[in-house]
UniProtKB/Swiss-Prot annotation:
Species in which this protein is naturally found: Zea mays
Job of this protein: Probable transcription factor required to initiate organ founder cells in a lateral domain of shoot meristems. Involved in leaf formation.
Protein's name in the database: WUSCHEL-related homeobox 3A
CDD domains: homeodomain
A biological process from GO: plant organ development
Keywords assigned by UniProt, alphabetized: Developmental protein, DNA-binding, Homeobox, Nucleus, Transcription, Transcription regulation
Encoding gene (name): WOX3A
Tissue: Predominantly expressed in tissues enriched for shoot meristems and young lateral organ primordia. First expressed in lateral domains of shoot meristems. It is then expressed in the margins of young lateral organ primordia. Not expressed in roots, seedling leaves or fully expanded coleoptiles. Also expressed in vegetative shoot apices (five leaf primordia and the SAM) and in the male inflorescence. Expressed at low level in the female inflorescence.
Gene Ontology MF: a single term: DNA binding
Region (Disordered): 83-106, 239-262
Superkingdom of source: Eukaryota
Matches recorded under SMART domains: HOX
Compositional bias per record (Low complexity), positions renumbered to this chain: 83-99, 251-262
PROSITE patterns membership: HOMEOBOX_2
Length: 262
């Protein structure tokens, strides 16, 4: 059986060279007249038909669009990778700056008030795991306590002590609450200052420890320092028990009246 000749177009190198030169010169979609002229010119270099010229230009435009699309996709991917890298760079910067607060917290232990250090070691000589930043905070707070008490508070302290002491002393203190109690205030001012400083330090320590424990409830149990476990001591500024001043005053008045009648 005779074989039918193939209808597939096999362009020669000369035909391809001419077509590519025409495409680079700006010919993209030739019309029917131009296709006929190109086909007649290329027929000198081999077998060719008008439909072959038409499909060649169509396929060449499609391949060029595909190449352009690939270039654009590669460029977009590169830009996206650069944006991801720039967005990840600021996120890693807080890790490097996180060492600054730790250094500041470690350096705060150098500014601890000497009185607080002495008071802490005197009351808790076994406490070696005390937090340095809390100790520095206590030192700053205790350093702000005024060394001079309010005269009215001093007078009330003297009056309370005089009432607790007895009737005669209460009468003398009542006659001069601000003047007569100066000696008692001078004698107990140092003790009151130490007790008040210790109380103020423990209150601030308790507040800071409470805030720290509240923030660490989710992370785990926080071990409180010994100063926060100690209950607060309340100073008795006013007497809580009856001192019998009325009975003594009534007895003294009755004795004075009996002597006057005699």
């Amino acid at each position: 059986m005779p074989q039918t000749p193939s209808t597939r177009w096999c362009p020669t190198p000369e035909q391809l060279m001419i077509l590519e030169e025409m495409y680079r010169s700006g010919v993209r979609t030739p019309n029917a007249a131009e296709i006929q002229q190109i086909t007649a010119h290329l027929a000198y270099y081999g077998r060719i038909e008008g439909k072959n010229v038409f499909y060649w230009f169509q396929n060449h435009k499609a391949r060029e669009r595909q190449r352009l699309r690939r270039r654009l996709c590669a460029r977009h991917q590169q830009q996206y990778a650069q944006q991801q890298a720039t967005a990840a760079a600021p996120a890693s910067s807080p890790n490097s700056s996180a060492t600054v607060p730790s250094l500041a917290a470690g350096g705060s232990s150098a500014g601890v008030h000497p009185a607080v250090m002495q008071l802490h070691h005197h009351q808790h000589p076994y406490a070696t795991n005390f937090m340095p930043h809390q100790l520095g905070y206590m030192g700053q707070q205790v350093a702000t306590v005024p060394p001079v008490l309010n005269p009215a508070a001093a007078g009330m302290v003297d009056l309370a002590a005089a009432r607790a002491g007895g009737g005669n002393k209460a009468t003398a203190a009542g006659s001069g609450a601000y003047g007569g109690g100066a000696g008692l205030y001078n004698s107990c001012s140092s003790n009151q200052l130490e007790e008040w400083e210790a109380t103020d330090a423990m209150e601030h320590c308790d507040a800071s420890c409470g805030a720290a424990s509240g923030s660490s409830d989710e992370g785990g149990a926080l071990q409180l320092p010994p100063c926060c476990r100690r209950p607060l001591k309340t100073l008795d500024l006013f007497p809580t028990k009856s001192t019998g001043l009325k009975d003594e005053c009534s007895s003294s008045k009755s004795s004075s009246c009996s002597t006057s009648t005699n």
